[in-house]
Every structure is written in structure tokens, then in C-alpha cells.
Amino acid sequence: MKASEEEYRLNFFIKNDFKRKICKSCKTPFWTRDEKKEYCSDIPCTDYYFFDINIKSQPLTVKEAREKFLSFFEKRGHTRISPKPVLARWREDLYLTIASIVDFQPHVTSGLVPPPANPLVVSQPSIRLEDIDNVGITFGRHLTTFEMAAHHAFNYPDHYVYWKEETTAYATEFFTKELGIPEEELNFKESWWEGGGNAGPCLEVTVGGLELATLVFMQYKITDNGNYTPLKLKIVDTGYGVERIAWITQKTPSAFHAIYGNLVYKFFNKIGVAYIDETLLKVASRFAGKIDPDNPDTIKIHRQMVSKELGIDIKAVEEELDRAAKVFQILDHTKTIMLMLADGLVPSNSGEGYLGRLVIRRALKVLRLLKSDVRLYELVKEQIDFWKEDFPQVLKNKDYILDAVELEQQRFEKILEKVPSIASTLARKSEITTEDLIQVYDSNGIPPDLLEEELKKKSVKFELPRNFYALVAKRHQTSTIKSAYDKVKLPKDMLEYITALQPTEKLYYKDQYMRSFEGKVLGVYKNYLILDKTTFYPEGGGQLGDTGLIIDEKSSKRYEVIDTQKVNDVIVHILKEEPSTIKVGDNVRGEINWERRYRLMRHHTVTHVILAAAKKVLGEHVWQAGAEKTPEKGRLDITHHKTLTEEEVKLIENYANSVISDRRQVKPLEMNRMEAEMKYGVSIYEGGVPNSATIRLLEIKDWDIESCGGTHVSNTSEIGAVKIINVERIQDGVIRLEYVAGPALVDYIRETQAKIVEASKIIGTSPDQLTSRLRRILNEIEEKNNLIIQYRRIIETELLNNLKPYEINSNKIYIIEGLGDEEENKEILRKLTSTDNTIAISISDNRLQIATSKNMRVDKIVEELLKGGGKGGGKGTFANVILNSKKSKEEIIEIVRKSL
């Protein structure tokens, strides 16, 4: 959609002598006070000429630019609010905070809840990876991490705050009066914005080639068929670039110098790259507006312009600018890494962790291309020291940040050992596509740039997309939200049936200890029953649905409830059989299986206790990745970058039992969503993000508070005690804890005791002597194993000395029959094929192990063997084959002869 001219023809512009002009280059309309201006002052229509503009403001650091902006709007009636983390954990569909408006999506922008203040001002650290491949090349125009300073106003039908006129006036006053930019240099470029299903006209504020701000007027909803319908809630959504404000006031040759100051020189030194010539940098930066990173020709033209301007050889210009761009990339990426990890990201192969790992590996790749020996964590440490006052969380979580980065580097170095074999596999393809490279990166974590050199050795060429990392990030930056209907275990016809039913009154929230109740039947469908009220808890938040009985008061017939589910606010009781005696309008009595429910309550509450204990022991980066509460045990999946030590598990367990012994009150609370977020932070969403204006919190006194819709005990003492019975790494970056509490702990102790008694009987000792007896048995086994190894070595030596090869065309073929296990065979085969032109085959019935010397390939032999039927394969010089039928030595030798 293109807005009409009237959308932008503001009284403010007319009264203040702004003229509407059409840019001579891009043909876009813009507003300016300079009647002679022909261009919109945005790149690539002009060069960066802000260096030549006389700006009255003193040079501002990022910190000073941020404060100047926030104070300006505070003085003009805006409430300053704290920024949110760079991980958008209040959103189920988005992993990273990409703009300040994300702070208020979806619940404020949809009108579900009011904003924390109106109007408000915030400076929100944001991360966008769509431009990650362009960082450094454009001298700071593109960054992965930046601060979006913003003032927002939310205009309701019955409450107008301000709109276009005031927003444009604020921008003009800030840039001309507060920063001292000459009025004739300020331009407002007409544009259109769309995002997150909303749209509206916007104005881009440009000065001297730099876009300093975007003023969005969110006033339309984009419908499913692509039409635009007016919104009742009209939102002023502005975004001012804090780093660009610092850059335009400092007039440094790159934005990186304005953002990082002396850290720029420190990074060049630590990385081991000579600092770029200052004159070359200034000229290159001035012409950088001409660069369109998506068009490699513009990069080439830019460098030719620099070469011509300075009279320097083009190759020297390219080499120096390439090196500097790589250092700028590392500056940018290490700050992004620091912020991600400080806010709790754990690098992994999925979700937000995937995006964190992508940035880390790209930084490591760049260091490798620069042939630098510096450890990445050393550079991140410099960033922490530099930003610790601006972002206190980076200092608080310093140990975790550095530990996680070093561990990622060690993993990356191990992965790079695979490069030769991956390159060999790719080299066999007739064409290497972008999809192939993404597949290799996703499966093995190998950047294509590092495959390039290995593939060149094999005379294989491929085209590396300039935006490779952006392509990969785009595939992983969002998550699909499941609807309430997708999450529930009910058939489609049942879901359709309940759409007309009223919400169920949740008695389990009024009294979590209520065991029975009376209710009225609102719906009966097959074996599904819906009542006006219930104390049966429906499955949710990892807690299983209640079971029990529904009793027909007319006939006294009892129906077993085998599960309870919920769709939106309607609770469905699933019965073992169809309730033939129950009709809509009948009164029934419900009784829950209290013993089962009470076990679930204990396991649910102790899950909260253990999660907080894990954070205390392991660090604030720990986040709930999943949970399940059953009557038999509880299960909690947490994000963490390492396997837990025995000592860490013991500490978590000790803290949890201490909280139980302290008899702490457990209390549910209901709060306004925004109020809860501002008071407790987004960690309240550990167990999921509820979609309501008021949210239910569970507070364990002086220990933990988070959003939770489950049922809980009212005091930690009711849990009794807890024992962690299993800890395992279930996927990269996720650790699973399993535990038992209360009666389930007693059951576990009994079962364990029974196993000890049984084991003692098997080995003929008493339970108290079990450990010492097992040690003796293990020592005896070890002695026998050592003896077996000695015998095997004797047999192996004898075999190698006496085995005679078959000769085929100057090739030696060894055949071994019925020898030892597979690993032992493999070792003998390796020794036999240590010299060129040698093949060794071990035969055990119809199973074959085949090895060749390094100058031969095993695949041709395998191919010939499998012609007679069978399965198997291998790569390089080793293979395993299972034939459909057993073959004699002579038959195998004949097959080998054919393959040669």
C-alpha cells in the first residue's frame, strides 16, 4: 500500500516552511527547509557529507547520546521505562528483541493490556541478524546489535495522546535544538512501514547521508487477504539510532570508532592486525554510502573510487579495507555475543541458542581468516569491561559468558577437524548449491568460507552467497505458535462441539485442596463431559490432567474420569465410557483422585523449587526448557552449556531440601501483566507465556516467583523431601533433571532397597558388604581382561607373521577367517594394509570387514561384493558388508579380482 500525499502534508511542515520535494536520484518525496536541495540526503543518493556539517553539540559517546535522548523526552511528559532483555522471552513467536516496539507486542499493541506508561520513552538494546554479512563493509551503517531509542504513544478511541504533528515536532526540536543540527540540513523522507501484521505511513529523518530516525504511525491491520483495515489503537512507534547520534556528533571515520572509542585500537592490536591508514579510512568512509552490500559491483566501484582519490594501488586498498572490515565485524559480533549470553542465552542447535551459536561461530571464522591466535573470550572480556556500567548484567554474568564462549571455541575447533572429509563429500557433487552449504552448516557447524580453501585444493569451485549467514539466521529467527486447538488432545469434532459452550468456572483456583464438588452439565458428547464448574485440573504446564469420578445424582451411577483437558476456557472431562444416564442440565457430583492430585501438587511445587536452586548453583542463564509432573516423578529440562558435576547436583538438591525444611509459604497471586513484568522481569515466563491481561503468579516466599496455572501445595513443608534420581544431557544445551518427592520418594527408596537386596543375593553377599564384594569382582575381571589382551597379542603376532597374501596384478590380498571381535579385526586389518597396494578382508560367516591401503578405494570392492545381494558400505579405506549368503575364500578373491 502507498499512502496518499495528504498522509504526510502536516500542518507542522507548512507552518515551519518545509517544502515537499522529489529526490532527483531515488524519486522519493521528502520535506526540507532548504529550497535548493535536490536530493533526499539519504544514501546512496548522496555520499556521507555529515562530516562537513557544522553541528553545535559536543561529541557524544553512546552513553551520553542515550541519556540526552531519554532526558529530552522525560522533560516533555514521557515516563522513562527500563529496557527489556535482548532475548524476547515474553514472545512465543520471536527469539530476539529486534526493535523497541517488540517490548509491547503482542499484548499492548493488540489492546489486551495497557502500556506501562503513556506516553513513554525507552532505549532498547536490539539485535538483528538480517544484516550480519554486511557488518564492517559499510563502516557502521549495518550492525547486528544497536540501541533503538524510542518514544511511544498509544492513542485509544477515548484517550488521545499525540500523533503525527507532535511526533514530527519532537524530532525537529531534538535534532535542531538539542543536537544543534542546522535546520536546513534536516529532512523527512516519506515512506511506508509494515511489520508484525500492522502497517502505516512513516517518515525517515535524514541528515548528511545518515538516517538518524524513523517515525512510524501504526494505524492499519493487514488482513489475511492482504487488505488494510484501520486500527482502533493508533500507535506512535519511533526509532532513533543511538549509535548514529553518537557518530554524527563525533564525526569519526566509522561508526565503530564512535561506539567503541579506544576499544577499536585495542582490538586491532589484540587480533594482530596493523591499524588501517587513517587517511584511507576517512576517504573510504566518505564514499561508503555508495555501497550496496547485496551488489558486489558497488563494493568494487567504491574501492576504485578510493584508489583513484588517493592514488593508491587498488589491490592495496582492497587488502587494507578487507582486514579493517573483519576487525570491525569482530567488534560488533563480540558485543552481540556478550549481550545475548548476559541475558541468559545458552548456545545450542535450536531456538535462540542456534542464533547465539551462529554469531559466535561467525566471529571465530573471521578470526581464523585473519590468522589470529587470540581466544575469542579475551575479546569478549574487553567488551564486558567496556560496557559494564551501561549493562550491569554483563558484569554480573561475566563468569558464565567467558566460560560459554571458550567452550564454544573448543567445540568449533573440534568441528573443523571434519573439514577435509566434508569437502571430499561435497567435491563429488556435480554442483554445490547454497542449499548444500546451509545443510553442511546446519548439520556440522562448518562455515562455507572455511570449506573454500579445501575445495580449491580439489579444483572445485562454488559460489558463496554474500548473505549466507543472514539466510541461515532467517530460517531460525522465529518460532511457530501452536493454537489452543493444536495443543490439546481432543478430536476435531469435539473441538467444534465445545465452541458454543460457556467458560468453565475453575474451582481448583478457589481451593486447591477441594476434593469434591457439585456441578451442572453443559455438554455431553460421546465420552466427553463439560460442566459449568469443576475442581478437576486439566492437563497444562507439564502437569497431567486429573482423574477421578463423576457421579450421576439421579441414578447414582459412577463414571470414571480418565483424563481432563482444556480448550481456551472450557474444561473437558474425558470419561472411560459414554455417560448414558447423564443429559445436559443434569446435576452431577465430581470427586478427584486426591492421592494422585496431591502427588502432582508436590511434584509441581518442587519443580519451581529446583528451578530456582539450579539458577542459584549454575547461574542466571538457566531457563526452563520443558517440564513434566506425574504422580511417580517430576522432570525439569533446563538450559545449561555443560554436563552437571556430582557436586553441582548435590548443591541443587541441598538448596531444594533446605527450602522445603524452611516451611516457606507458597502463594498464588493475580496481577496485571505489565505490572508483573515491570516488578519481576520476564523470568516470570519460565513455564510459558499466558495470553491474558491478568496473569496468575506462584510465589514461594523469598525464593521464586513465576507465572503458573498449575495446582500447588500451600507450604514447602508439604513436599516432605526431594531426591534427584537422574541427570542427563538430552540435547545440545539442555540438561534433564528427574526427581521424586513426598510419597514418590518413599516408593523410590523402597524400590532401590529391593534392588540392592536382589543384587546382593545374586553375587552371594549381604547388602552392607555389596560395595566391597563388587570391587573384588571388578578387580578379578580386570585381571582376566589383561590376560586376554596378552593372549590376543600373541595370536595377532603369530597371525601377522604366518599369513600369506594372494597376489593379483601386483596387489596383495589377505583373507582372515573367524577371528575375534570387530574392533580387534579392524586393528589387524589396519596393520596389514599399512603398505601400498594392499587389501585385507576378515570373514565371519556372511559378515565381512574390508580394509585397503591409502592409495586404494574400498567402495569399488563393496560395489562388486553387493552385486550378489547384501547390504553395507563404508568410506575411504574401510567398509562393513553383510552378504545374503556365505561365500568361500576363493569366491571372495575372485570378486576382488573383478573389482581391480
Curated annotation (Swiss-Prot):
Name of the protein: Alanine--tRNA ligase
GO cellular component, one term: cytoplasm
Gene Ontology terms, MF aspect: alanine-tRNA ligase activity; aminoacyl-tRNA deacylase activity; ATP binding; tRNA binding; zinc ion binding
Lineage, opening ranks: Archaea, Thermoproteota, Thermoprotei, Sulfolobales, Sulfolobaceae
GO biological process: alanyl-tRNA aminoacylation
Cofactor detail note: Binds 1 zinc ion per subunit.
Cofactor requirement: Zn(2+)
Amino acids binding Zn(2+): H604, H608, C708, H712
Tree of life domain: Archaea
UniProt-listed Enzyme Commission number(s): 6.1.1.7
Function: Catalyzes the attachment of alanine to tRNA(Ala) in a two-step reaction: alanine is first activated by ATP to form Ala-AMP and then transferred to the acceptor end of tRNA(Ala). Also edits incorrectly charged Ser-tRNA(Ala) and Gly-tRNA(Ala) via its editing domain.
Keyword Zinc: yes
Compartmental location: Cytoplasm
Comment, domains: Consists of three domains; the N-terminal catalytic domain, the editing domain and the C-terminal C-Ala domain. The editing domain removes incorrectly charged amino acids, while the C-Ala domain, along with tRNA(Ala), serves as a bridge to cooperatively bring together the editing and aminoacylation centers thus stimulating deacylation of misacylated tRNAs.
